[in-house]
């Protein structure tokens, strides 16, 4: 009986230690999980050009210019492309479009071929600048566009090549975005029809509102 009693006491101690340590382990895991979540966002600044960036950050003039030039190159590859100037102007407004080589994989679109292998794209209206993904010392950038037509769901606002909206097209704004916002967008491989980019923006706006509403509901639930 004495041996059995000792065994039972030792088993009880082990179980007690296990139950006592479990909440601690869960708490530590939660801390690391939350820290990981916090690192998924990035603070970025939005500028219309390199001069605006340099004025706001005098010690970073070189980085501002480099980011701006890289954004211009990115815009040439990823901006929405249109077969005609009229289609581009209809979505982005007068004096907001420029001619560019037709997409590399334009498919069977006849219009670019008829205009000498050229298409039309919106001018870059600004760029987003933030730290590179992975915590590097350099900066990443993303070209931004801004429709100037009342019919556009993004009239007077900054949007990226994927149609995601970043609010008023004012220079010098700072905001928090997912790190994925700074990731390079796929190169444009075909032209779109008039109104096509506006539809993409509208869908993105709807998704952003839905996500914001979901996050708000989750916060209220967690807050009790």
Curated annotation (Swiss-Prot):
Region (Disordered): 180-224
Top-rank taxon, per record: Bacteria
A Pfam family matched in the record: DUF1190
Bias kind Low complexity: ranges: 204-224
Regions that span the bilayer: none
Family affiliation: Belongs to the UPF0441 family.
Name of the protein in question: UPF0441 protein ECA0329
Organism (species): Pectobacterium atrosepticum (strain SCRI 1043 / ATCC BAA-672)
């Amino acid at each position: 009986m004495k041996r059995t009693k000792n065994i039972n006491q030792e088993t009880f101690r082990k179980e007690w230690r296990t139950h006592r340590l479990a909440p601690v382990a869960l708490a530590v895991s939660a801390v690391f999980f939350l820290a990981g979540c916090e690192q998924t966002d990035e603070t970025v600044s939005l500028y219309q050009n390199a001069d605006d960036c340099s004025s706001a950050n005098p010690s970073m003039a070189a980085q501002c210019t480099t980011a701006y030039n890289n954004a211009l190159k990115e815009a040439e590859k990823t901006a929405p492309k249109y077969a005609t100037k009229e289609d581009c102007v209809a979505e982005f407004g007068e004096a907001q479009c420029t001619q560019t080589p037709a997409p590399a994989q334009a498919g069977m679109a006849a219009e670019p071929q008829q205009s000498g292998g050229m298409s039309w794209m919106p001018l870059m209206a600004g760029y987003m600048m933030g730290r590179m993904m992975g915590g590097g010392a350099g900066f990443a950038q993303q070209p931004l566009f801004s429709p100037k037509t009342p019919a556009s769901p993004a009239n007077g606002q900054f949007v990226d090549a994927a149609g995601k909206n970043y609010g008023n097209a004012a220079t010098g704004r700072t905001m928090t975005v997912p790190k994925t916002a700074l990731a390079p967008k796929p190169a444009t491989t075909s032209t779109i029809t008039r109104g096509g980019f506006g539809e993409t923006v509208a869908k993105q706006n709807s998704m952003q509102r839905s996500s914001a509403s979901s996050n708000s509901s989750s916060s209220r639930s967690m807050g009790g």
